[in-house]
Amino acid sequence: MEWQEFDRGVFLVNLLGIVYNPETKMILIGKRENNPYLKELSWSFPGGRPAYKNELEDYLKIEIKKKTNLDVSIEKIIFAKTYPENREFLSIYYLCKVESGEEKVGEKFTEIKWVKPTNVQKYFTTSLHKNLLDYLKTLE
């Protein structure tokens, strides 16, 4: 059965890590190109679509490591949302803390950078929910 046949309750889930450095009060974002699900996407938080074989948090740690070379701990779920650009796409945002590693560009990113949480919106070309933006302000 094709997932498009369901009229509700089926989403393409994406896990995203707000990788935060409490010492510098900065978060890590990555630049992507050619995202097949959100054509407008440029900068994003590291993460990806989970496989069925892993716990969500374990999968997110693996994806962040592949994309940034950083080992992180998962602190908590921050927020979940769908997008006006594609309502079938559900993102779950987690607060993550760097445990070890030196950041470097990895899988699917062409660039990574640390930014002030209140500057994230300057980079993103997709919508960021007001509740997420309000939360990011608390990190500064």
What are these regions (language model features)?
Residues 1-16:
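Acidic, metal-coordinating catalytic segment for phosphate/diphosphate chemistry
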Residues 81-102, 135:
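Active-site-adjacent beta-strand/loop module that shapes the phosphate/pyrophosphate-binding cleft
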Residues 26-66:
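Conserved Nudix-box catalytic region and its N-terminal flanking loop in Nudix hydrolases
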Residues 17, 77, 94-96:
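A structural signal for short, well-ordered beta-strand segments
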Residues 69-79:
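A short coil-to-beta-strand element that immediately follows conserved catalytic motifs
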Residues 104-135:
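NUDIX/MutT-family hydrolases
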